[in-house]
Amino acid sequence: MSDVTTAEFNEDGKYIRKIRSFVLREGRLTKGQSQAIEAHWPAMGLDYTPQALELTQVFGRDADTVLEIGFGMGASLVQMAKAAPEQNFIGIEVHKPGIGTCLSEAGAAEVTNLRVYHHDAMEVLEHSIVDGSLERVQLFFPDPWHKKRHHKRRIVQAEFVQLIRRKLKIGGVFHMATDWENYSEHMLEIMNAAEGYKNQSTTGTVVERPEHRPLTKFEARGHRLGHGVWDIMFERTA
């Protein structure tokens, strides 16, 4: 049994810490995922501690660092790390099968600039990531909680984006993507009201998908069916 902290917010966007316990059963993992964790966790896994992470020690170099919150199965994160060997990448994911698949693909791709946490992103950000240390924070396709009464559960809230701002360097970018138009509107509303940020869109709305974000199979299928995807990028200015 593992205690994992999950994010929840009240109607004013105030972060509420709640502890939810659930069983992380090995039986949920495929044989390949289990083998990948056993083989690659020693080199690529980061065990959560409430102490500040020394990035130069973790990666053995001083380089721009990109952090992704909730990388799912990790395919696009591995692609990004492979395509930008000059950068460091950190992924955070709470679901163990995603960790296993990501490590499997990272091992096959022979990437050396990727590290992953199996922990809640809020705790990692609050306690392990040094303020002003990140070049980019990525939040791709978070749960939209599409029912209005559930909007308070959306991770993008006023307090959350200020936590992200603290962790970004001046000039660093918070990059969000969603395939739910209402959530993109919510993201823009929160970000436009947030101090210390500037929208990178010349129109003050969304941006075209940047080259650094790979086109996923799910997204490509959505495009063929006429479904939209909205990318939002805000730069830390203060």
UniProtKB/Swiss-Prot annotation:
GO terms for cellular component: tRNA methyltransferase complex. Disulfide bonds: none annotated. Substrate binds at residues 147, 179, 216-219. The active site is at 143. GO terms for molecular function: tRNA (guanine(46)-N7)-methyltransferase activity. It catalyses: guanosine(46) in tRNA + S-adenosyl-L-methionine = N(7)-methylguanosine(46) in tRNA + S-adenosyl-L-homocysteine. S-adenosyl-L-methionine binds at residues 68, 93, 120, 143. PROSITE patterns: SAM_MT_TRMB. The keyword Methyltransferase applies. Pathway: tRNA modification; N(7)-methylguanine-tRNA biosynthesis. NCBIfam families: tRNA (guanosine(46)-N7)-methyltransferase TrmB. Belongs to the class I-like SAM-binding methyltransferase superfamily. TrmB family. This is tRNA (guanine-N(7)-)-methyltransferase.
